[in-house]
């Protein structure tokens, strides 16, 4: 297993993605995050395990196509992002939910 600098791991994960599909996946211990596009699966796994103190079973990544945006006659693109769906070991879902969704 390659070693990663823990100071750099926190910068890999940008934010959790909370959509209808992501909420349905949470019932299966799968959590969705937006990560930087150059992050690899082992780096994402190490970052999630370090940030949330959970055991990651599997990491799936998705790089959706960039969307076109038009401003007047100029055509541009939205910034590209990478989506990571992280499967957490059974029993660890309470740890990650307390951090992502604290009780008010």
Swiss-Prot record:
Record GO cellular component, one term: ribonucleoprotein complex
One example of a Gene Ontology biological process annotation: translation
Domain of life: Bacteria
Gene3D superfamilies named in the record: 3.30.70.330
Keywords: Ribonucleoprotein, Ribosomal protein, RNA-binding, rRNA-binding
Cleaved signal peptide residues: none
UniProt GO molecular function: rRNA binding; structural constituent of ribosome
Residue ranges crossing the lipid bilayer per the database entry: none
Keyword Cell division part of the UniProt annotation: no
Pfam families given in the database record: Ribosomal_L23
Function, as annotated: One of the early assembly proteins it binds 23S rRNA. One of the proteins that surrounds the polypeptide exit tunnel on the outside of the ribosome. Forms the main docking site for trigger factor binding to the ribosome.
PANTHER family from the UniProt entry: 60S RIBOSOMAL PROTEIN L23A (PTHR11620)
Family: Belongs to the universal ribosomal protein uL23 family.
Assembly and binders: Part of the 50S ribosomal subunit. Contacts protein L29, and trigger factor when it is bound to the ribosome.
Protein's name according to its UniProt entry: Large ribosomal subunit protein uL23
Lineage per the UniProt record: Bacteria, Bacillati, Cyanobacteriota, Cyanophyceae, Nostocales
